[in-house]
Amino acid sequence: HGNSQFYSHSLKLWEGMEQALNYNVMHSQRGIINLFHSDGQRDAYARRGNAMINQGDDAILLDREGCRKLLPYLDYEQTRFPIYGGLYQPRGGTARHDAVAWGYARAADRLGVDIVENCEVTGFGIENGRVGTVETTRGSIRAGKVGLAVAGRSSQVAAMAGLRLPI
């Protein structure tokens, strides 16, 4: 249930990202189809699709022929894992990851954020329950406010400041 709410909110954010950042992130909502290859996967995708529909998002459970109509170029006959069907999300899409990063960086710069590349955080100086300094491989940085944007190591860096992330 929580995943469908997260997905729904994410869709809305993606749909407004270029406007919010004033930057072309090459977002293209051409839809996404997650294929399933067993009855068990079909049942799981049916539950996911129903949760998405209950959340107000589009989701269509396709059988094999429905997939064949939308994806005629796939091999349906000589496959190791036969295609039983798919969950189609018409509003799903893609964006260029590098364009998203540049869009965020430019927006952050407009807000007065200094981004220091190739500079590893090694710890934080906590003063009165707040981060006062960021310790890095290039020395200490004093800061009135600190943002955390480190992708795959968010939990580890947050832990250096005594924070535990929910995801």
Protein language model regions, located:
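Dinucleotide-binding Rossmann-like beta1-alpha1 core, especially the glycine-rich loop
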Residues: H1-Y73
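A short coil-to-beta-strand element that immediately follows conserved catalytic motifs
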Residues: H27-Q29, V116, P166-I167
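A short, glycine/Asx- and small/polar-enriched loop/turn
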Residues: G40, L71-I83, G125-G132
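Short glycine-/acidic-enriched loop or helix-start segments at secondary-structure transitions
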Residues: Y45, I126, V157-A159
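Basic phosphate/pyrophosphate-binding loop/patch that engages nucleotide-derived ligands
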Residues: N50-N54, D109, L163-L165
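Helical element adjacent to the flavin cofactor pocket in flavoenzyme catalytic cores
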Residues: G86-K145, A149, S154
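Glycine-rich beta-alpha-beta "Rossmann" dinucleotide-binding loop(s) and their flanking helix/strand
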Residues: Q156-I167
